[in-house]
Amino acid sequence: MRNGGICMAGDFIITGGRPLSGTVRIPAAKNSVLPLLAATILCSGPVRLRNVPPLADVDTSLRLLRGAGGAACRQGGDVLVERAPTTCRLDAEAAAQMRASILFCAPLLARLGRAETVLPGGCRIGARPVDLHLSGLKALGAQCREEGERLILTAPSGLRGADITLRFPSVGATETLLLAAATAQGSTTLRGAAREPEIADLAAFLCRCGASIRGAGTSTIRVEGRRTLAGCTFAPMADRIVASTYACACAAAGGRVELTGCAPATYAPLLEILAQMGCSVECGPETAVISRFGALHGVGKVFTGVYPALATDAAPLLAAAMLTAKSESSIEDVIFERRFVCAEGFAAFGGRVETAGRTLHIAPARRLSAAEVRAPDLRGGAALVIAALAAEGTSRVRETGSIDRGYADFARKLGQLGAQITREMRPGA
């Protein structure tokens, strides 16, 4: 168990077959909070982020800021960054734990003229190269070199605006280039940009601090560099993947769950598929109510894609809900080639699954039964919890630390919905 209780190891013990009922308020999005914490490096004054959940990746981000000389801490449900980093080197151990650590390089480079890190970590769901980040930074005037496991970025003449076209709409690369361009000299036009709502959230934060950004949320973003940015208080957007998780849990286990505080429009493709499967889905501006009291049906083949398509992170969650459908489904993830490592766990529950390349095929299973499985990664681990909720008997999901990277109080919140789930710490965890 990590200090402060942020990242716990151990197992989830789940007795399935109980329908879910109740309300879940969706917290701030991890995939928004992490780039926002990186963006605080650009700010000359304090930054307060509201209602930030106690996630392992947030804890790692605070370690990165403090390790580079910044002053950052939690205050109740908020995160306060009182002072930006003063040194250019990111803590190697923390950086290696989290894919998003690469986002901290651009603002360090912009503020201090240099950034040093190790190649980032995160879930092993496929190749996630940083070449788009680096080629974009080079276009803005950065120089990049590798020394062993270390990546060193410098900008001897500062960063200057440029016209950049991404060959793929990478969310991380788009965020990196927004962070770099916000205080670069001159204008930057970014074409082929990612359109995810987290991009628009980052741009809204930067603009609140004094940046000039137009077009965030579209494929073309224009940035007028500003010499300095101020601090601000900001409430990050809600987590559409966490909302998707509880929606899929309700579909798998049955019952009625109300999700509040998260715009259904941000995860509409998933809700549409659940409706096609036989769930009742009622949506308001910030609320979705998912009900499932009858049988689920397969929907043929669906695909993930870049926003506004079905999110890649939602694919294993949706697959877990499809395990008990009365006809076939398949999901192809066009983003990551190893998204369905959790398929082995699905099979242990009795799911009739088969992987072929990036596609998971799901045939009707008469029933799911209890099993002992291992959480392979963040979303795959959550998907196995969902499968256990639908299975008959008592299951064990082992090595759940990866789940803590994206879900706060997961067992407690599921328990409040009526799930029978506890956490058991293993000796030495």
Regions found by a protein language model. Give the residues of each.
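Short, structured segments at the rim of ligand-binding sites
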Residues: 2-429
